[in-house]
Each structure stands twice: as C-alpha cells, then as structure tokens.
Swiss-Prot record:
InterPro entries: TET5. Catalyzes the transfer of one adenosine molecule from an ATP to an mRNA poly(A) tail bearing a 3'-OH terminal group and enhances mRNA stability and gene expression. Can also elongate RNA oligos ending with uridine molecule, provided that the sequence is adenosine-rich. Mainly targets mRNAs encoding endoplasmic reticulum-targeted protein. This is Terminal nucleotidyltransferase 5C. GO terms for cellular component: centrosome; cytoplasm; nucleoplasm; nucleus. Belongs to the TENT family. The keyword Cytoplasm applies. The gene is Tent5c. Its EC number is 2.7.7.19. It holds the Pfam family NTP_transf_7. Interacts with BCCIP and PABPC1; the interaction has no effect on TENT5C poly(A) polymerase function. Interacts with PLK4; this interaction leads to the TENT5C recruitment into the centrosome. It catalyses: RNA(n) + ATP = RNA(n)-3'-adenine ribonucleotide + diphosphate. One of its GO terms (biological process) is in utero embryonic development.
Length: 391
C-alpha cells in the first residue's frame, strides 16, 4: 500500500502537455537567441535546440551520460501558461548527469566551451581560440557547488537583454524551486528525439508526447497558482536568501498570497535567510543591483515599484537584526530607488532629495536631541582627524 501511495503521489507531479503548450515549447526551442561577445568577439546566433543537441552529443562522446534534459524556470512557465505575468526572460536548461569527482566538473565545463566553437560565424579561425578565451568572451557566470546535498554546476551565456542562456548540470540538488509558480520543468527528450529522427515538422496532428513536472509536488495545484497568479510554497525554511527578491518580484507583477495567514511567517523566513546569506551591506548592494539588471532589463518603470515593495517587506517582517542593521538595509533600498528615479529623469538628481525614515524608539526619550544640523565641509590647511569622540 505504501508503494501505491508513493506512486500516486509521484504521478500527481507530472502532466502531459497539450498541443498549444507543445507548440509554444517548439517556438522557444527554435527561436534564435544572440549570445553577445565581449570586446571584438562576434555575436553567436544559437537556438536552444541546437545548443542542447551539441552539448549532449559531446558529453556522451566524452563518456558522460545525460539522463535527461529539461527546460526550467520562467521559460517553462511561459510554455504552460502564455500570459502568466512572469514573461520568458530566463532560458534555463537542466542536464541531469553524474558528477562524482572534480574531473567530471572540469570535463563538463570544457565540453560546453568547446561547443561554442560550432556557433562562431564562418571565416573565424577556430584553431586559435582556446576554451579559456571562449569563457572570457561569452560566459556571464560560472558556478560550481559541491556539498553533502548539492552537486551541480552552472554556465550562463551572456545576453545583453537579460535573456542569458543558462546551462545547469545537476547530479543532486536539495531544492529546485522557491515558489509553486517557478517549480515547473519540461522534459525535452521526446521532442529532441523527434527533431533528430523525423523528416516531418512539428504539427498539431504529428508531434511527440511531452511531459512536464512540478517540483512543488502537485502539478495541478501549481498550475492553478500560475494561472491565477498565486504565491505559495512548501518548507519555506529551505528557501535561500534570493527567495526574498523573487517574492518581491512576484508581488510587483500582481501575484498575491494564496494564504494570507501564512504569508507573514513566509516573509519572516525569507527576510531572515536573506540576511544570513548576505550579512554585509556591500554584499546586499551587489545582490540587489545584479538582480535588477538581470530581471528588469527592459522594465525600467517597474524597478522603483519593485524596490518599494521589497523595502516594505523588509521593514515589516525583519526580526533577526539589530535596529541599526535594519535601518542600514532600508536606507540602501531607498537610495537604490532614488537612483532609479534619477536615471529615469523623474527627479533631477538624487543628491537633492531628502530621505525620511521611521525614527528609532529611543527618539521618544525627552533627553534625546532629535535634531542634527549638517554644516558644509570646512577645509583645513593642516591634517585633521576624520573622527570625533562620542559624548
């Protein structure tokens, strides 16, 4: 009986795609995506179909068996529900492979870099281009994770419009999603086999069976959340620090919590994890700036709204910080928001804007002087210490 229950539970996480969904998947896989080179390196014109087939065949030639290949992230969500509010920015591909030693990690990296040679324009002397050169020219991000629960690597190919092609090679990973709406993976093997073996084009009456999986566990429930723009998750304590940024991104796109009572607990978990993973203010700034660049490349108008939502969540749900640390992060978010407005010429200059923040509790003390008068800097001819003793 236990086996039957487990089998039923597993089957709930899978669903067969209909023709409209297969058609959108075909469009995503065959769309030409530019990979922009740094410096004088030419732009590579690739399709996901071609890069997957090239990398997969080269991996298997090198002795690394690919268990399956999947489309992940917002691209998978776009295939399932076209106008879902998330768009189709990320082009994430997952290759399930065995990575028992460092040698396999290195081999995977070399295979991907050498595969890029296939996409260089005609006339380029490929013999003089090394894998290291290709990495410097076309790779936006290179990640390797080796822990007791996670063994995977990521190679992100650069696109100036934020549509990076991300190739993820996974041996094991503890958690593959943050919220139900980003938990979908579409297994590509049947369609890739069709491309290789069929002389007929994909059509409504002649296409392979394609299966999707929700890592959330219940495909229909997650699909309903995606259709109706609902925010839900499982085991929120496992969500990494970036979950707070993704949650705020969902809110700015008019997603709403599926359960209003649980959302405050979820927000507190995410705020705590964000400050655990990014304890330093400079780390927080880098993370926020990178997130804005990657997820709002063509949505300048949404950046300010996003930062204000993030600020509200941090202000209301942060319980793990000293007061000054919390205020420091809130001020960082406010300054980033002002910079966004200045870049959009909505205000003339961020330096001419006064920031107001909620006073600390000790301001209510009658002996506390709540006025600080800023004087213009004075130039001294002799060296003068930059610190003053505290009274």
């Amino acid at each position: 009986m236990a086996d039957e229950g487990s089998s039923t539970k597993d089957s709930e996480s899978f669903s067969v795609l209909n023709w409209d969904q297969v058609s959108r998947l075909h469009e995503v896989l065959t769309e030409v995506v530019p990979i922009h080179g740094r410096g004088n390196f030419p732009t590579l014109e690739i399709t996901l179909k071609d890069i997957v087939q090239t990398v997969r065949s080269r991996l298997e030639e090198a002795g690394i068996k690919v268990q399956d290949v999947r489309l992940n992230g917002s691209a998978a969500g776009h295939v399932l529900v076209k106008d879902n509010g998330l768009g189709c920015k990320d082009l994430d591909l997952i290759f399930h492979v065995a990575l028992p030693t460092e040698a396999e990690f290195q081999l995977v990296r070399d295979v991907v870099l050498c595969s890029l040679l296939n996409f260089l324009p005609e006339g380029v002397n490929k013999l003089k281009i090394s894998p290291v050169t290709l990495k410097e020219a076309y790779v936006q991000k290179l990640v390797k994770v080796c822990t007791d629960t996670d063994r995977w690597s990521l190679i992100s190919l650069s696109n100036k419009n934020g549509r990076n092609v991300e190739l993820k090679f996974v041996d094991s990973i503890r958690r593959q999603f943050e919220f139900s709406v980003d938990s979908f993976q579409i297994i590509l093997d049947s369609l890739l086999f069709f491309y290789d073996c069929s002389s007929n084009p994909v059509s409504e009456h002649f296409h392979p069976t394609v299966v999707g999986e929700s890592m959330y566990g219940d495909f229909e429930e997650a699909f309903d959340h995606l259709q109706n723009r609902l925010i839900a998750t499982k085991n929120p304590e496992e969500i990494r620090g970036g979950g707070l940024l993704k949650y705020s991104n969902l809110l700015v796109r008019d997603f709403r919590p599926a359960d209003q009572e649980e959302i405050k607990t979820l927000e507190r978990y995410m705020c705590s994890r964000f400050f655990i993973d990014f304890p330093d203010i400079l780390e927080q700034q880098r993370k926020l700036e990178t997130y804005l660049q990657n997820h709002f490349a063509d949505e300048e108008r949404s950046k300010y709204d996003y930062l204000m939502i993030l600020r509200r969540v941090v202000n209301e749900s942060t319980v793990c910080l000293m007061g000054h640390e919390r205020r420091q992060t809130l001020n960082l978010i406010s300054l980033l928001a002002l910079r966004v407005l200045a870049e959009q010429n909505i205000i003339p200059s961020a330096t001419n804007v006064t920031c107001y923040y909620q006073p600390a509790p000790y301001v209510s003390d009658g002996n506390f002087n709540n006025y600080y008068i800023a004087h213009p800097p004075v130039t001294y001819s002799q060296p003068y210490p930059t610190w003053l003793p505290c009274n």
